[in-house]
């Protein structure tokens, strides 16, 4: 019975194995990319509904400007490395929230949030990036 259970577990692990496109290393996928994207979009939308967006037009414009440059560079990189089909998984959004914490985060699919508390520590677009 143990041999059968061990064989079953081994088969499950092998079925979930795949190669990382860029590096070729092996990975075990317990959750599909689509499930991750769907879940992260739900979590992001829940967060954005409760977060207080910044009213500072200049700072918000800076976050969007830098974000668009990062998005373009990311998409160029994916295309140049044979992963153009991954670009469809991104629906870029850039938000500045009115929160004094020094923080920022991104979610799968191109959802980026910057906290206002981070901006006094940067003096240029390059530093924010």
Where are these regions (language model features)?
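Sec-dependent signal peptide recognition
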Residues: 2-10
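Peri-catalytic and regulatory segments of divalent metal-dependent proteins
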Residues: 18-129
């Amino acid at each position: 019975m143990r041999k059968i259970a061990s064989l079953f577990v081994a088969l499950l692990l092998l079925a979930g194995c795949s190669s990382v496109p860029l590096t070729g290393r092996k990975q075990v996928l317990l959750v599909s990319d689509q499930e991750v994207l769907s879940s992260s979009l739900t979590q992001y939308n829940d967060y954005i509904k409760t977060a207080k967006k910044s009213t500072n037009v200049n700072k918000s414009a800076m976050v969007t400007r830098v974000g668009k440059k990062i998005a373009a560079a990311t998409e160029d990189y994916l295309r140049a490395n044979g992963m153009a089909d991954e670009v469809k998984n991104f629906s870029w959004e850039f938000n500045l929230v009115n929160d004094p914490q020094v923080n920022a985060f991104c979610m799968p699919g191109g959802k980026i949030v910057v906290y206002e508390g981070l901006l006094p520590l940067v003096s240029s677009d390059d530093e924010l990036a």
